[in-house]
A protein has these predicted regions:
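Gly/Pro-rich cap/lid or specificity-loop segments adjacent to the active site
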Residues: 2-223, 336-341, 354-361, 367, ...
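Short, proline-enriched alpha-helix->beta-strand connector loops that line the catalytic pocket
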Residues: 230, 363-369, 391-392
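Hydrophobic alpha-helical segments
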Residues: 372, 378-379, 391-392
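Short alpha-helix in the alpha/beta-hydrolase fold that links the catalytic acid
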Residues: 251-253, 381-390
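Alpha/beta-hydrolase fold active-site neighborhood
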Residues: 218-350
């Protein structure tokens, strides 16, 4: 059944399709999940035989954009393509994976379930959509951030499906090594924090006052979670986006309602920014995207790197922020992540990863690939991206 409707300048068609939860086991053994497939097309060209462009959303754990109107990259793409948005398994309108689904499992079973939501399964889902709904027509892909990781997995598994690949800020190191990623990205986060303090010098003292108050240990968010200094530091993930510096500055401005008392507006905003309500898989799967047989366990690589850097200590002033880095404390302190705790710890210890990249196949790649690398990317290190692109691909 197709659900069709119109947005300003866009004709939308939605369909749902079942896929195996575990592609290696098949439907009978593991059951199925549902994917939401949303197709966008220029209303004036709805009957035209347009080429297909599959958008690969950033993440991990990110669902596709919900357009309000025809603008941005979608406007440009609709000039030439029929755009296909497949909500990745576990996200958006596809069968969700939430903490409650994992909390009742033992740690090993929970880790196995999480691992079924990595890039290899996502690519198999996309191939099923392409074969089933589009008659096996080849398509181009546009990958944003983590979507670039998916792109290289796709080129490793099914390059024959692809006419061209476009990537924005998302070429992984190959083979992926979590420790190497964080050794580089902590430097970028430190630089972004320093840049914020240069732009807003009064925030050095204002943020120190917030951290000092949180260090007393009795500040609760509206949902009852205790707001710790390290959870406040994690808001630095926004420094990797524009206008992240400005957003964080304006958040800090409204921190105190009275001397010593943090405002309800500030606490509500911090909860919204750090609760993972909209995307619990982002932190849960964060390090698993670097899991590879050549690299061994990810072993909480971000926490290990942070422990090597006293400048990020909660007691240091000026206070440093952290970025796109998952830490074990999140699964104790953040209410909506607690159900994942045992499973994500088991996942961090996993060594027998399914490989996501076929380096020989990538070296022989003949699918056109164009990548935009952001020179000061805080989350996907530009140096690692360029090293991968410099290799035969």
């Amino acid at each position: 059944m197709t659900n069709e409707y119109h947005l300003p300048g866009i004709r939308v068609a939605e369909r749902r399709i079942e896929v195996p939860l575990d592609w290696s086991a098949g439907t009978a053994a593991a059951g199925t999940i549902e994917l939401l497939v949303r197709e966008l097309v220029d209303p004036d060209r709805a009957r035209d035989e347009l080429p297909l462009l599959a958008f690969l959303q950033g993440g991990p754990g990110g669902s596709n954009p919900r357009p309000l109107r025809r603008d941005g990259w979608i406007d440009e793409a609709l000039r030439d393509y029929r755009v296909v948005l497949v909500d990745q398994r576990g996200t958006g309108g596809s069968t969700p994976l939430e903490a409650v689904d994992v909390a009742g499992l033992d740690a090993a079973a929970g880790a196995d379930l999480l691992a079924l939501h990595r890039a290899d399964s996502i690519v198999r889902d996309l191939e099923h959509v392409r074969e089933t709904l589009y008659g096996g027509r080849r398509w181009a892909t546009l990958g944003q951030s983590y979507g670039g990781f998916l792109t290289l997995t796709y080129l490793s598994m099914a390059p024959e499906a692809l006419t061209a690949c476009y990537v924005c800020g998302g070429i992984p190191g190959t083979p992926p090594r979590a420790a190497e990623v964080y050794a580089r990205t902590f430097d970028r986060v430190a630089a972004k924090t320093a840049e914020m303090y240069r732009r807003f010098p009064a925030d050095v003292e204002a943020i120190a006052r917030i951290a000092d108050r949180l260090a007393e240990g009795d500040v609760a968010l509206p949902d009852g979670d205790v707001l710790t200094v390290r959870r406040f530091q994690s808001l630095g993930i926004d420094l990797g986006m524009k206008p992240g510096h400005e957003r964080l500055h304006w958040l800090v401005e409204k921190a105190f309602a009275r001397p010593g008392r943090l405002s309800e507006a500030f606490l509500a905003d911090v909860q919204s920014l750090s609760s993972s309500a909209g995307n619990p898989l982002f932190w849960t799967l964060q390090e698993s995207i670097y899991g590879d047989p050549a690299s061994g366990p990810t072993a909480w690589a971000a926490q290990t790197e942070r422990d090597r850097r006293p400048v990020f200590d909660e007691s240091r002033r000026p206070l440093m922020f952290t970025g796109e880095m998952a830490f074990p404390w999140m699964f104790d302190e953040v209410r909506l992540l607690r159900g994942f705790r045992d499973a994500v710890h088991a996942l961090a210890e996993r060594a027998d990863w399914t490989p996501l990249y076929d380096l020989d196949r990538l070296a022989a790649n003949d699918v056109p690939l164009a990548a935009a690398v952001y020179f000061d990317d805080m989350d996907v290190d530009a140096g690692l991206q360029l090293e991968t692109l410099a290799a035969p691909l």
